[in-house]
Amino acid sequence: MSGTRASNDRPPGTGGVKRGRLQQEAAATGSRVTVVLGAQWGDEGKGKVVDLLATDADIVSRCQGGNNAGHTVVVDGKEYDFHLLPSGIINTKAVSFIGNGVVIHLPGLFEEAEKNEKKGLKDWEKRLIISDRAHLVFDFHQAVDGLQEVQRQAQEGKNIGTTKKGIGPTYSSKAARTGLRICDLLSDFDEFSARFKNLAHQHQSMFPTLEIDVEGQLKRLKGFAERIRPMVRDGVYFMYEALHGPPKKVLVEGANAALLDIDFGTYPFVTSSNCTVGGVCTGLGIPPQNIGDVYGVVKAYTTRVGIGAFPTEQINEIGDLLQNRGHEWGVTTGRKRRCGWLDLMILRYAHMVNGFTALALTKLDILDVLSEIKVGISYKLNGKRIPYFPANQEILQKVEVEYETLPGWKADTTGARKWEDLPPQAQSYVRFVENHMGVAVKWVGVGKSRESMIQLF
């Protein structure tokens, strides 16, 4: 061993210095992202909260889902509809980023952009960056989505109520390792074409009635490839640079919601991706220590689209009133939403999974006309109170909800712009939610516009 030194036989002092530097480097985790997530079954008004935060954001990103999500944002009296584009694209000073966890239907992306261009959205393609690792939704994925729904209806007498945007079939291809990504489309097109044909044939063998114009679709895809090429980056490197360069405000816009999450939602009536906080790390390629504030968006009552258990649902004049006053129709599907009282069991469960740092309580004004308002505070199963949210749908159908009845305010809140403008009973309603959740409410929404979000702190 002469002439060499054992690794643990270093000259005094050298190891300590190196370790200290590494500890400092580890401590410099970089910027933290702010996350906005739905805390119920979607349609909570996430777009409005994102829009509020996006005004001073440097980067606004989507991390999961596809054009099955629907966000409506009103700016200067104009209503923009977003499905795949981050709604931060309205902010001309921000970069919008579509992460690897998102599934992208290119025809849908350009169609959506063109619709919003007609309403005044300018130069969006200069502000959009797309991860090269994002998977592609093909037209046949969308066709299969519809065929699967028909099959489910025939076999089980019920369907999931998907948006038929091809999201589930695309995530299935991804999990089966047969999917194709943006990076595949932009490299060797012959190789891409061969894999595309294989994938198309696989789907045709499973669904014999499926018709696919393979050559026509490939021709269109080749055209889209050239249009998106300038927007595509290595998404992991892009996010790393964004978080470790000069300080930046990075906002993550969740699509869908906690109870639609593939793991934690009311399975099987869920979407096909993780729309809870874990999906931010896997869908953007960032570590947990870069997650900052996580804002949960909560509607002042509860809505749900399609079938599945809904403990606080009101199939009566209260449900109709909420549906009509709240204009509860889906942005993506136009379907009527089911309505019911606020359910704190759902919210506590969403908080367990996501660790909300604060809440946004939206559409409080919809409750303005009620003389009393009920809030679901706990569930009973076979006469016993249960502390958890049941995983099994049949059990969730059977729970008995315990309600607390609060006085209504019977006053118009739509003109309120600060906390003091709200009637005392409306303030009590907000505080009741805070106290039961153990999470502060940061915003209260009393209307459609940006100005109607009251900030509390």
Curated annotation (Swiss-Prot):
GO terms for biological process: 'de novo' AMP biosynthetic process; AMP salvage; aspartate metabolic process; cellular response to electrical stimulus; cellular response to xenobiotic stimulus; glutamine metabolic process; IMP metabolic process; purine nucleotide metabolic process. GO terms for cellular component: cytoplasm; membrane. Homodimer. High levels in muscle. It is a peripheral membrane protein. Residues 1-24 are annotated as: Disordered. This is Adenylosuccinate synthetase isozyme 1. The active site is at D43 (proton acceptor), H71 (proton donor). Optimum pH is 6.6-6.9. Gene3D superfamilies: Adenylosuccinate Synthetase, subunit A, domain 1, Adenylosuccinate Synthetase, subunit A, domain 2, Adenylosuccinate Synthetase, subunit A, domain 3. InterPro entries: Adenylosuccin_syn_GTP-bd (IPR018220), Adenylosuccin_syn_Lys_AS (IPR033128), Adenylosuccinate_synth_dom1 (IPR042109), Adenylosuccinate_synth_dom2 (IPR042110), Adenylosuccinate_synth_dom3 (IPR042111), Adenylosuccinate_synthetase (IPR001114), AdSS_1_vert (IPR027509), P-loop_NTPase (IPR027417). It catalyses: IMP + L-aspartate + GTP = N(6)-(1,2-dicarboxyethyl)-AMP + GDP + phosphate + 2 H(+).
